[in-house]
Amino acid sequence: MSNIVVCVQNEDQKVTAKQTIDAIYKAGFKNVFVQYYHRETKGLDELEQIDYCRKLGLNIIFCHLGYKNSRDINSIWLEGETGEKVIDGFIEDFKMLKERQIELVVMHLVSGKEPPIHNEIGLNRIKRLVKHAKEIGIKIALENTRQHIYVEYILENIKDKNLGLCFDSGHYHCFSKDKFNYSLFKNRIFAIHLHDNDKISDLHLLPFDGTI
């Protein structure tokens, strides 16, 4: 049976991550995912959030890695040290998360409306990332975002059981207009982000509150 997983949202200015985790626990949910964005948070930092979830007996199904601000994911497609440092940062994340028994991470390949064109520079960097993840026993799920061509490009060119897809239903609806290459991805789906929208904006509505 599939696990229903609730996000530990850690960027709310009025509600702390601890309050969010407590609310999830009191509501009776058993599974969560934690945003591991290296973001300054009120109260518990991101690693402490993982520890607190475990203290309450919550299962952490995966961690979602950061992709913007100090970690500009678009740079992985460009020549230069910045892209290499981004990959190095992810590798360090893997080590820290593996120490806390996290076995699945979700990540984006691009950010924004006009990312660089997909190319072998980015492909080779993701190959390096997958190699390190496999060595320590972590699986990577790539999320379909505004331009799903990047996920298709990487998964077509890296045939590895440790690399798969986090299918985002909302992005599929409003960005891809319900068009997706299921034949390529159907056996490589590691996680699903389930939310709804009006097919125009990425609203993150509850299922059935939109037009999917």
Each model region followed by its residue ranges:
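Active-site acidic/histidine proton-transfer and metal-coordination neighborhood
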Residues: D72-G164
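Short secondary-structure boundary segments
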Residues: Y36, L109, D196
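N-terminal pre-domain/capping segments
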Residues: M1-D88, K98, D160
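Charged helix-capping and loop-helix junction motifs
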Residues: L44-I50, G83, I87-D88, N119-K127, ...
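Acidic/histidine-rich catalytic cores of soluble enzymes
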Residues: V32, C63, K127-T211
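Acidic-and-aromatic substrate-binding clefts and catalytic sites of carbohydrate-active enzymes
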Residues: V8-A17, V34-E48, S70-R71, G112-I117, ...
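Residue-level detection of beta-strand scaffold positions
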Residues: I21, G57-L58, F94, I138, ...
